[in-house]
Amino acid sequence: MTQTVPYRCGRIAVIGRPNVGKSTLTNALVGTKISIVSNRPQTTRHRLLGIATFPEGQIVLVDTPGLHREQKHPMNRLMNRTARGSLEDVDAALLVTESTHWNEEDTLAYNLLNDTGIPVVLVINKIDRFKDKSALLPFLTHINENHTFTTIHPVSALKRKGLETLVSDLLALLPEGDPMFSEDEITDRSQRFLASELVREQVMRQLGEELPYATTVEIEYFTENTGLFRIGALIWVERESQKAIVIGKGGARLKEIGVKARQQMERLFQTKVFLETWVRVRKDWSNNEAALKTFGYE
């Protein structure tokens, strides 16, 4: 008689310092892009659920902003609160770090997770950078000697390497139970939210070095017609000089942001998109916690 394998379902927080590939890992496990990515700090600013459904179970990933040691800036304080708050009501956590690089912010994340008592899986990301994987051995030895993890997984989220065994170990940590979401759901966030994030992703990719804190995106309208989404995206900055940078010479930069964001939306929403973008100034909004909350920062 064949024994039925019990279905498992639960929530797993994805924690780590900025720019180690947490959102790339979330996207890879879900199987499609729901979290924006760039090589700039503060790309992820909100908590977002990624729903990864498999025949054996459902993993609800809680993608979080990167943990910062620097908390003088209100944005950093809010993002740290969001990351810490994501540890409530989770069954386990993924601590994501970068291959061979462990710093004080990794230790901050490790200590935070260690205090919770939940199972912690270490994901060593970006191993595709090493042709000779034996170069990882000294780092793995150091980690094992100085830290305690339920399991350790070297992976490449970008290349989707090492994910099968990671998924198997994560499912084993979850309680038996019915799925929380239907099989076709991939996130708890609305299409309106995802549209704003895809515009912000292009701003970060093209202007993140010049405007690290100063931009956010608000959706002014989002209408759905048969075969077409009409979306109006307002990009907020803090100075007139920043507005000029976002618009670019003859509007070229803003046009490029719009084109790239629209292409990403059409890929995600599986429909044609008409996207209108424009830029406005709200002085010092990122230094004002009340203003941050009006823009949806929790």
From Swiss-Prot:
Keywords: Cell inner membrane, Cell membrane, Cytoplasm, GTP-binding, Membrane, Nucleotide-binding, Ribosome biogenesis, RNA-binding, rRNA-binding. An essential GTPase that binds both GDP and GTP, with rapid nucleotide exchange. Plays a role in 16S rRNA processing and 30S ribosomal subunit biogenesis and possibly also in cell cycle regulation and energy metabolism. Residues 42-46 are annotated as: G2. This is GTPase Era. Residues 155-157 are annotated as: G5. InterPro entries: G_ERA_dom, GTP-bd, GTPase_Era-like, KH_dom-like_a/b, KH_dom_type_2, KH_sf_prok-type, P-loop_NTPase, Small_GTP-bd. GO terms for cellular component: cytosol; plasma membrane. The lineage of its organism: Bacteria, Pseudomonadati, Pseudomonadota, Gammaproteobacteria, Lysobacterales. Residues 8-176 form the Era-type G domain. Residues 16-23 are annotated as: G1. Residues 125-128 are annotated as: G4. One of its GO terms (biological process) is ribosomal small subunit assembly. Monomer. GTP binds at residues 16-23, 63-67, 125-128.
